[in-house]
A protein has these predicted regions:
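Catalytic-core elements of nucleic-acid end-processing and repair enzymes
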Residues: 1-271
Length: 271
């Protein structure tokens, strides 16, 4: 994966909005999505692979138990894809990865953990169009028909009922992005979407045809506090990311933590 170290708040803005102009429609649009991580060393490894590294086949048992024990709160989940997306939003180990269309929401996730302010963070940028080069013909045709780069749940339902059906579409692994239904406010507020690999053992950034699709923007530890405070000024905070009392309490706890004395690095001083 290509890598670029960010030197300032202004450079971060320049990097995430680079090449956003689309001459064909005379608007600022691009095909990139973003993922913020508090530790730059982290790869694009789904929670399922982290939770069950020795036996990812436990995936079906995880989903079965989620449906069984969460039944009362899942009555509106009529689609397999909606079920998996809901589980991902609430911390269930899945093969999905969280992304956002908003680079500033990604910057929030890269800087929200105050226990990681001594570690470089990162925003990973992905060109969805390049990832879609790996798709089997049936899926590419759906995207062409809809003139888009991202699947909706209805589009997925029309071609594959679950992970097994998805894998049968091609002997070669592939990955794609899909938008969940906004059944909970945090999905809409985070401008969220997910990536998904047809083979749970294959990471999205290891696909041969997508190797040039990713860029890692490294946020040095000494920049985290400045970026964090400036995000608060433009209302990118836990109050918006996690609607409700949970987000308010997270925001208050961080806002009143003694981060300045702990992590402020005057310019020109040794960091």
């Amino acid at each position: 994966m290509r890598e670029r170290v960010i030197g300032s708040w202004d450079e971060l803005q320049s990097a995430v909005f680079d090449n956003a102009w689309d001459e064909t429609i005379l608007r600022y649009r691009n095909n990139r999505v973003f993922r913020g991580v508090s530790d730059n060393r982290w790869g694009l490894v789904p929670s399922l692979n982290r939770c069950c590294p020795q036996n990812p086949a436990l995936e079906r048992h995880i989903l079965r138990n989620f449906r069984k024990y969460g039944y009362a709160d899942l009555t509106d989940c009529h689609s397999f894809w909606q079920l998996v997306a809901m589980g991902q939003q609430f911390g269930l180990p899945t093969r999905l990865l969280d992304w956002t269309y908003s680079p500033l929401v990604a910057a929030h996730f890269a800087t929200e953990d105050i226990n990681s302010y001594h570690i470089d963070g990162a925003i990973i940028c992905c060109d969805m169009e390049k990832v879609n080069y790996c798709l089997p013909d049936a899926l590419q045709e759906i995207l062409r028909k809809e003139s888009c780069n991202v699947f909706s749940m209805d589009m997925l339902d029309s071609v594959a009922a679950d992970f097994s059906a998805l894998q049968r579409l091609s002997p070669d692994p592939f990955a794609f992005f899909f938008e969940p239904s906004s059944t909970v406010n945090r999905i809409a507020n985070q401008y969220a979407l997910f990536s998904l690999s047809s083979d749970r053992d294959v990471l999205i950034d290891t696909l041969p045809c997508a190797e040039d699709a990713f860029l890692r923007l490294v946020i040095p530890a000494h920049l985290k506090l400045e970026i964090r405070d400036k995000l608060d000024y433009i209302n990118i905070s836990e109050r918006m990311i996690y609607p409700g009392l949970d987000g308010i309490c997270r925001w208050i706890a961080r806002r009143y933590a003694p981060l300045g004395p702990m992590f402020h690095h005057p310019k020109g001083k040794d960091r």
